[in-house]
């Protein structure tokens, strides 16, 4: 039994190191767009999603620059809700607009455009990048509360845009 103790100790150390070093998605880090977004991204965001009749400053939206191990290029997730604004022009009855952009050539390409209900249960993030990478971008898990209950949507990148791959209902309301 004594000769197995060093082997067991070594296995435990290797297991702890493997768990600690295992690639994890970046932690939730929504920041003010004007602080982190490249100017060409803000220009593309305005061109793709905003009308000149809406006086919206995209620099006041929130952006999360997602980068996980094995990902080819950053994914910029955009929460269209404007900080410190009484009106939210990109929000409506079904939720608020969320976008995803990746660098392409000298500009940016929109790879995600959806409306999400931003209200989720405590302890849950609205969008959770995973360590699984498809076609160069991470899978995303989107948490939503709706008429069906609490649901998780798994989105995968098909090479052009994100699409729903799986819907799991975790709790009925």
Listing of model-derived features with the role each one plays in the protein:
Residues 67-85, 134-143:
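Acidic/hydrophobic-patterned starts of short beta strands in beta-sheet-rich repeat architectures
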Residues 54, 86-93:
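Short consensus segments that form the blades of beta-propeller domains
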Residues 96-103:
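Beta-propeller blade signature
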Residues 53-62, 114-126:
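Repeat-based blade/solenoid architectures
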Residues 91-96, 146-150:
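Short, solvent-exposed loop/turn segments at conserved positions within beta-propeller repeat blades
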Residues 49-74:
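N-terminal secretory-pathway/extracellular module detecting exported/lumenal segments
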Residues 3-7, 13-40, 44-53, 121-173:
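Acidic, small-residue rich beta-repeat scaffolds with periodic aromatic anchors
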Residues 104-105, 158:
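Short loop/turn segments that connect beta-strands within beta-propeller blades
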